Amino acid sequence: KLLQWQRPAKRWVLKTPHHLEFLPLAKKYFGEVQFIWTHRDVEECIPSFLSMVSYARILFSKEVEQKDVAKHWVRKNGFMLEKALNYRAKNSAKTLFTDISYKALINDSISAIEQIYADRGESISPELKAVFQKSNKENPKGKYGVHQYKLADFGIDEAYIQQFTKEYEQFQQNLDFLLGHYLSH
């Protein structure tokens, strides 16, 4: 609110997993908040996240112990998911959350975006749709290369991740069943 006091924004877009543990505060201080939750396979996104964190740490450290990065951030991600799921269980209004799979967003982004707007009682103008289509065409996945990483780089495996994400993975399976194509692309 401080950042926008002179020029109020129509809409804020906050895109980081760190917001997952602070959903009640977002609702309290921003009132008409709406959460768009893009769901990813945790065994795919957590190693990507660990790689990103490791590269960021290299900027400020002579040595980065990737096993330590993994131990901290896998637990932290599990904690954030748990906090978000607990909040969601108490505040499950359809107007508060829209669930979209990351794969659907990548494979059919226009349909996913149209669903996000529809859940808000809005629609995409033909002009905005054209902007999205142009952006998709000009920026295909992998345009700037591929980010490569493996769980083994961090001294962990899928079973280690699942210790901290079981509840979320079950939630995701239920969503896939309930929402069909929005989560299965």
Which stretches of residues belong to each language-model region?
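Active-site-proximal structural scaffolding
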Residues: T16-H19, G31, T38, N77, ...
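Alpha/beta-hydrolase fold catalytic core
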Residues: K1-L25
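Flexible loop/turn segments at secondary-structure boundaries
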Residues: H19-P24, E43-I46, I106-S109
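PAPS-dependent sulfotransferases, especially Golgi type II membrane carbohydrate sulfotransferases
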Residues: L3-W12, F49-H185
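Conserved phosphate-donor/acceptor-positioning beta-strand/loop module used by diverse small-molecule
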Residues: K15, A26-S51
